[in-house]
Curated annotation (Swiss-Prot):
UniProt-annotated catalytic positions: 154, 215, 268
Induction description: By xylose and arabinose, probably via the xylanolytic transcriptional activator XlnR. Repressed by simple sugars, probably via the carbon catabolite repressor protein CreA.
A family per Pfam: Lipase_3
Species per Swiss-Prot/TrEMBL record: Aspergillus niger
Signal peptide range: 1-21
Protein's name according to its UniProt entry: Feruloyl esterase A
Cellular location(s): Secreted
Binding site for substrate: 98, 101, 268
Listed result of changing residue 154 to A: Impairs catalytic activity
Result of altering residue 101 to V/S: Decreases feruloyl esterase activity
Length: 281
């Protein structure tokens, strides 16, 4: 599988014309470490949260047998946050959700005007909505000064996006970190997320959409089927580092999506050197 180096990325962006103005190379070490921490949790979700950071307390499991949606409620008393994480695709049942591209009204969030979301992931969301909202409410009531963080990889990333959208209608302090996220909804949904999560600037955003090299999943479902991405994109190229992370705030096809990757490839399963469920970090 072809890997994209930082040098190659710079050459590519240098030829991207106007898109280059909306892409900058390098992020702070603090932000980079934060992205790696959330990626660790998201990748560990494939293996029952193996090797998660020592400060994190594992809480209640989220699960629905019909959709095979898996997740957990976690807590970190050091960073003062309640974390909801969703596992990515782990079964044929999940794959059926992945391939249901029918855009569906986001009826559980009427504030999201004209919003339509990925049909399969919406089925996944409504299958666990009651569990998620109940468990988050319990934790938020017990720890009212804690931030709410939602994260996940692949299918788990889109589940995280729908969950964060729903929680943002009730709570003010919701943050979203996704890794290899498919397009989760239409332009109205992307616009709602951008407004709700202050995506107008990397300095204010609370929606960190992390991509890697030529990961093919962010190119799905196709934009010409009515789908769009939200969030500020943080594009990691190899060798991964804070300096080799690009901040992409313009056209969504300028960074990862411009590499032409399609579907599950090496760049999708591995983020910051961590492979989904491998637990070798």
């Amino acid at each position: 599988m072809k890997q994209f180096s930082a040098k190659y990325a710079l050459i590519l962006l240098a030829t991207a014309g106007q898109a280059l103005a909306a892409s900058t190379q390098g992020i702070s070490e603090d932000l980079y470490n934060r992205l790696v921490e959330m990626a660790t949790i998201s990748q560990a979700a494939y293996a029952d949260l193996c090797n998660i950071p020592s400060t994190i307390i594992k809480g209640e499991k989220i699960y629905n047998a019909q959709t095979d949606i898996n997740g957990w409620i976690l807590r970190d008393d050091t960073s003062k946050e309640i974390i909801t994480v969703f596992r990515g695709t782990g079964s044929d049942t999940n794959l059926q959700l992945d391939t249901n591209y029918t855009l569906t009204p986001f009826d559980t969030l009427p504030q999201c005007n004209d919003c339509e979301v990925h049909g399969g992931y919406y089925i996944g969301w409504i299958s666990v909505q009651d569990q998620v909202e109940s468990l988050v409410k319990q934790q938020a009531s017990q720890y009212p000064d804690y931030a709410l963080t939602v994260t996940g990889h692949s299918l788990g990333a889109s589940m995280a996006a729908l969950t964060a959208a729903q929680l943002s209608a009730t709570y003010d302090n919701v943050r979203l970190y996704t890794f290899g996220e498919p397009r989760s909804g239409n332009q109205a949904f992307a616009s709602y997320m951008n407004d709700a999560f202050q995506v107008s600037s990397p300095e204010t955003t609370q929606y960190f959409r992390v991509t890697h090299s030529n990961d093919g999943i962010p190119n799905l479902p196709p934009a010409d089927e009515g789908y769009a991405h939200g969030g500020v994109e943080y594009w990691s190229v190899d060798p991964y580092s804070a300096q080799n992370t690009f901040v992409c705030t313009g056209d969504e096809v300028q960074c990862c999506e411009a590499q032409g990757g399609q579907g599950v490839n090496d760049a999708h399963t591995t983020y910051f050197g961590m492979t989904s469920g491998a637990c070798t970090w």
